Amino acid sequence: MHLLTGMYTAKVDEKGRLSLPSRLRAALSSEEVVVLPGLDGNHLMLMTPDYFENQFCVQIISTPLALMDKEKRQLMRKIISPAQYLDVDGAGRINIPQSQRDGVGIENKSECLLMGTGYAVEIWNPETFEKEDEECTESVSDLAQKIYEEEKN
């Protein structure tokens, strides 16, 4: 799988289907994807089943004792439980469940923003993303430095 990159706008049709841009379809190279709530609760994440099962979930359920940790159980309920496997149809569309779209303000016949973030695609209501982006006042350099310092320790 190639890294998922780029920013795209796409429209959800009257049946709730979202056409994936061709570059994202090629990078996903899968006939099935997983959609789940974003970690901030204001967008959705889309990833391959392989990445979801073998990387993403492994980070949350890192040990057999993970079920004994209250915070990990809560995270599993909020993120893993609502995850759904979706087929990519012959036209490159996915049908995101209404309940997941409602949770992040994406309606039928509305535009959404798709952002490749490496191993996942974030799906946003454009207005929500604009507000989120405005609230992030740190520069890219400052964010990178902060992450570097945290990883170093």
Task: Walk through the language-model features, giving the residues of each.
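Flexible "stalk/tail and boundary" regions
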Residues: 1-10, 14-15, 23-86, 90-91, ...
